Regions:
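Compositionally biased, charge-rich terminal segments
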Residues: 1-19
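Class I (Rossmann-like) S-adenosyl-L-methionine-dependent methyltransferase catalytic domain
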Residues: 9, 24-99, 106-155, 174-179, ...
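Local beta-strand N-terminus motif with an aromatic residue
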Residues: 97, 160-161
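A conserved beta-strand element that flanks and buttresses the S-adenosyl-L-methionine
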Residues: 164
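Short catalytic micro-motifs in class I SAM-dependent methyltransferases
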Residues: 167-168
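ABC ATPase nucleotide-binding domain "signature" loop
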Residues: 171
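A short glycine-rich, Lys/Arg-flanked "PGG" loop and its adjoining helix->strand segment in the class I
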Residues: 178-190
C-alpha cells in the first residue's frame, strides 16, 4: 500500500508539472470519479494510533512515512487542544456540544478526533470537496453537508454549539472571508463557540514557504497588512484561493464592529495552531 500511495501521488505531481492546468484538472476529476468504483482498500488506509482510516486523497498527510504521520496526528491534536481551550474559556465543555460543525473538514484531519469527544451523529462535516464529505460521513458517521463557492447559499440544517474552521480563512480573499464570518456567526446557537484559525503577522516571515509565487511578495504583504489590516494574494491557477494574512487588532476591531454585542472574544492564541496559525474563539452571547 505504501508503494501504491507514493505511486499515485508521484504520478499526480508529475502530471501537474507538465500538463496545462485545465487539462490536469480534467484528468484529476476523471480519476477521482473512477476511484469511487474501486474497493475501499484502494481509497483509504488504516494507520496505528490514528482513529479511522486516512483517505489517499487527504493531502494533509504528505506521505506514509513515520515523520509525516506523526505530524498529521500532532496537527489534529493541536486543533483539539485549542478547541477545548476555547470551550473552557467560554464556560463550556464537550458535554455541552450537542451540534458541531467542522467547516472545511477535508478528509477528517480534525474531525476524526472530534468524533472521539462528540457523538459522530452530532457532527456536521462540510466541505466543497464532495468526495471528502462522503468519506467523513462513511468513515466517521458524521452528517454530510456539501458547501458551495458562495457560502451564503449553503443551507445549514441547524444552529451549532461549536463551529471549527481550521485553515480556511487563511486561503480566502478578504471579502469572501468576511462573507463566511457573517454566515457562520448567523448559525451559532446561544453561547455557541466559533473557533477559527488565520495566518497572523508572524506568517509574514514565512511567505516563501507557501510557494514560489509568494517569495517576492513580502513587501506587498507587509504594506497591505500594515496599512489595510490584511492582505491577500492568489495561488497560480488557484480559482480564487491563495494566502491571506490578517493583523490581529484589525480583525478584532472588524468583528466587534460588525457583530457586537452578539459576539465576544473569549480566547486568542497567536500562532497557537501547530506553532503557525493564530487561533480565535468567539462566543455568541445574544
Amino acid at each position: 500500500m505504501t508503494v501504491l500511495f507514493r505511486g499515485v501521488r508521484g504520478a499526480r505531481n508529475a502530471l501537474k508539472r507538465v500538463m496545462p492546468l485545465a487539462l490536469y484538472d480534467l484528468v484529476r476529476g476523471l480519476w477521482r470519479r473512477a476511484r469511487l468504483l474501486l474497493p475501499a482498500v484502494f481509497a483509504a488506509r488504516a494507520y496505528p494510533g490514528v482513529p479511522g482510516r486516512i483517505h489517499n486523497e487527504d493531502y494533509m498527510l504528505a506521505s506514509p512515512a513515520q515523520d509525516d504521520l506523526q505530524r498529521y496526528v500532532a496537527v489534529g491534536l493541536s486543533a483539539m487542544a485549542n478547541i477545548e481551550a476555547g470551550l473552557h474559556a467560554g464556560g463550556r465543555d464537550w458535554a455541552d456540544v450537542t451540534a458541531c460543525l467542522d467547516f472545511a473538514c477535508g478528509y477528517g484531519r480534525v474531525l476524526r478526533w472530534l468524533a472521539q469527544r462528540i457523538p459522530p451523529g452530532q457532527i456536521t462535516a462540510c466541505d466543497i470537496d464532495r468526495q471528502a464529505v462522503r468519506f467523513c460521513a462513511a468513515e466517521f458517521g458524521a452528517e454530510p453537508l456539501f458547501s458551495l463557492a458562495d457560502f451564503r447559499a449553503v443551507t445549514f440544517p441547524r444552529r451549532y454549539d461549536l463551529i471549527w474552521v481550521g485553515s480556511l480563512f487563511t486561503h480566502l480573499p478578504i471579502a469572501r472571508g468576511r462573507d463566511l464570518l457573517a454566515v457562520l456567526t448567523g448559525i451559532l446557537a446561544p453561547a455557541g463557540l466559533l473557533i477559527f484559525t488565520i495566518q497572523g503577522e508572524s506568517c509574514l516571515d514565512r511567505l516563501a514557504s507557501y510557494g514560489p509565487e509568494f517569495a517576492g511578495l513580502e513587501p506587498a504583504f507587509r504594506e497591505g497588512v500594515a496599512g489595510d489590516g490584511a492582505h491577500f494574494a492568489p495561488y497560480r491557477g488557484g480559482e480564487g484561493m491563495g494566502i491571506a494574512i490578517h493583523r490581529r487588532d484589525h480583525l478584532r476591531q472588524y468583528v466587534q464592529a460588525q457583530f457586537a454585542p452578539s459576539l465576544r472574544l473569549v480566547h486568542f492564541v497567536p500562532a497557537g495552531w501547530d506553532d503557525h496559525q493564530d487561533v480565535w474563539a468567539w462566543q455568541r452571547i445574544a
